[in-house]
Design a protein with these regions (language model features):
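Hydrophobic alpha-helical core bundles mediating ligand binding, dimerization, or RNAP-core interactions
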Residues: 47-54, 73, 77, 133
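Conserved beta-strand-loop-alpha-helix junction that forms the acyl-donor binding cleft
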Residues: 120-124, 150-160
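Conserved GNAT acetyl-CoA-binding A-motif
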Residues: 140-152
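Acyl-donor-binding surface of acyltransferase catalytic domains
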Residues: 1-42
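Conserved active-site alpha-helix within GNAT-family acetyltransferase domains
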Residues: 1-4, 130, 154-172
Length: 173
């Protein structure tokens, strides 16, 4: 039986940066570094680390099923026109990758798309996901669009609530 996914959309021109910047600041003052894969270096080693982080964080997605092999992941997520390392926000605690927020470039369709946002279990509940999404909101501007879209399984209530807090609204596309 097919599940009706929750479709959400954000108009970045309405995004309240002043409201969410404190999440970014809190990460920085607590020693969490926010960066992008582009700034860190889009290397084979970093792509492998991104895969491992994505795999770990995806385990909690309702009805996710088995995660891709690295080769499948690379083919489906990296070797595609929508991939841009500037859209991959990373949260680092020292050298340890603890969170990711990957957004793909769909500017040809008039938007960017939040593919995955996740934080390792031991670092959850500290606002890191909100900080990463806030830090990465400028990617839409880099791509020349003002719309960010995402989808969620309806049982992924925490992700849906976080996005709605950020200003995402239900969409019918």
């Amino acid at each position: 039986m097919a599940v009706d996914l929750v479709r959400l959309q954000l108009d970045v021109t309405d995004f309240d940066l002043a409201r969410f910047q404190p999440y970014v600041d809190k990460c920085r003052t607590s020693g969490i570094r926010l960066t992008t894969l582009s700034e860190l270096g889009d290397t084979p080693e970093h792509r492998r680390a991104l895969y491992e982080l994505n795999k770990e964080c995806s385990a909690d997605i309702p009805e996710r099923g088995e995660f891709h092999t690295y080769d499948e992941y690379h083919r489906l997520r990296i070797e595609v026109p929508a991939y841009d390392p500037r859209g991959v926000v990373l949260a680092l605690d020292g050298d340890r990758w603890i969170g990711m927020a990957a957004t793909s470039d769909r500017r040809g369709s008039g938007f960017v798309f939040n593919e995955m946002t996740g934080v390792r279990v031991c670092h959850r509940g500290r606002g890191i996901s909100v900080a990463m999404k806030t830090f990465g909101i400028g990617f839409a501007g880099i791509c020349g669009v003002s719309t960010v879209r995402t989808v969620h399984h309806p049982a992924n209530e925490s992700a849906i609530a976080m996005n709605r807090t950020l200003g995402y609204v239900d969409a019918d596309w």
